[in-house]
Amino acid sequence: TGLKPFACKECGKSFSNKAYFESHKLMHAGIKPFECTECGKQFLLKQLLKSHQLIHTEETPFVCPECGQGYKSKQGLQNHLLCHTGETNFTCKECGKKFLLQKHLNRHKLTHSSEKPFICSECGKRFSRKDGLGMHQLIHTGEKPYVCTECGTSFRVRPQLRIHLRTHTRETPFKCEDCGRVFATGTKLQVHKVTHTGEKPFTCEKCGKSFTQKTNLNTHQLTHTGGKNFKCEECGKCFSRKDYLRVHQRFHTGEKPYKCNECEESFCRKDLLQTHELSH
């Protein structure tokens, strides 16, 4: 019939179902009657509690038909499926970066805000988000709780481990619809898709040159400043970026972290490994 006889006096929202109406009133009262026995977190609705409780188990009942990745909620699976289609419907007006979901865009927009209320007690670095602070603090503790069962490599966050595992399985679930090329992560697919569109959303304010990726713009901007602030203590060579210095230092230490899965030969730089792998 479409009748909604139950109207909320607080906000005017109407309901056809009395049970939904009663649950809605609890929201205004701040009452969350359903509590998780594992962590104490409280929820307004019983189904929200049930969905939450999957976090405390290894159960992932919602499986992607494309790549087999499991998720604890139907919404999580639906969000993941967008990675396979390559849809990026939400664009940041500040920098042009695109996102699969509105919530990811909202989270990103905080990086453009000057407001950073979350402060690290160890080093004073500020963050716009609480989870960003939490992840940063692992640097000080050295904690890397997510361990690869194949090779023992540890990671600070679970998504890093999940991506790393694909180096062992050689899984490449993200396919470009334009050329058929496949990628291990959705991010790499999005970066690749720009090669088909020719889009270069990141523009240098100094000279107007445009780039497909923000990292390329950041590197380019150093050519205007001429700054080489990172100095090698071994040989005195200076670099414009800390990661360039870190790679250079491997020549002194002999560290070769990039290993070929085919022949076990190791390299100090990832691009050298990629060039080598073409020989197989």
UniProtKB/Swiss-Prot annotation:
Any stretches that span the bilayer, and where are they? none
Q: Which UniProt keywords apply?
A: DNA-binding, Metal-binding, Nucleus, Repeat, Transcription, Transcription regulation, Zinc, Zinc-finger
Q: What is an example of a Pfam family matching this protein? A: zf-C2H2
For this record, an example GO cellular component is:
nucleus
State its location(s). Nucleus
* Record InterPro entries: Znf_C2H2_sf, Znf_C2H2_type
Q: Which GO molecular function entries does the Swiss-Prot or TrEMBL record give?
A: DNA-binding transcription factor activity, RNA polymerase II-specific; RNA polymerase II cis-regulatory region sequence-specific DNA binding; zinc ion binding
- Major localization class: nucleus
ZnF regions (C2H2-type) run across 6-28, 34-56, 62-84, 90-112, 118-140, 146-168, 174-196, 202-224, 230-252, 258-280
Q: Which PROSITE patterns match?
A: ZINC_FINGER_C2H2_1, ZINC_FINGER_C2H2_2
Functional summary from the UniProt entry = May be involved in transcriptional regulation.
Q: Give the family from UniProt.
A: Belongs to the krueppel C2H2-type zinc-finger protein family.
Q: What is this protein called?
A: Gastrula zinc finger protein XlCGF46.1
Q: Which organism is it from?
A: Xenopus laevis (African clawed frog)
